[in-house]
Amino acid sequence: MSGNSIKVPPESRKSIRAAAAFSRLALEKVHKCDDLYLPIVQMLEFALPKLDSEYSFEVWSVGRMGDNHGLTNPTEKTIILREDVYEKALLGHGRDRMTAAHELGHYVLHSDVDISFARSNEDLKCYENSEWQADCFGGEILMPYTKKDLLIGKTPQEIADLCGVSLKAATYQSKFFR
């Protein structure tokens, strides 16, 4: 997890999975695709604005973003990706695609919630941590449980290749296909 520790209302993996499945279905319908490989950047740029007229997507320079790879401002309904992350995500780099999906997770899960800053990570249970929730959402939308029948029996490397994610993400997410 990265970013600040922000305490949000608790969410289970099951509820995050449902939110990711609903979001993916809505985005696929608008973008007219249902492939296992989700074109996440195109979803953020072209499909999501059709579902939410107040939403905006921006790409900022490395100089402006600094160490932040992505930012989501729920009150302004904006997702921002750092330029190099955006470009690599378009090229299919798994880590950068996950960053884009992670930011979508913040947008979907945290737009209408009260947040508070934790004094330390020790004060947070993972299911109350906005970063864990967004990471979970990213894994669930890019490697969906709803398409687990296409993924069960595959090696983590095969899942990474099919879904366009890193080997680390595929290894972790594959534990939840059982």
Regions found by a protein language model. Name each.
Residues 1-178:
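Active-site hotspot residues in diverse enzymes, especially metal/ion-binding acidic/histidine motifs
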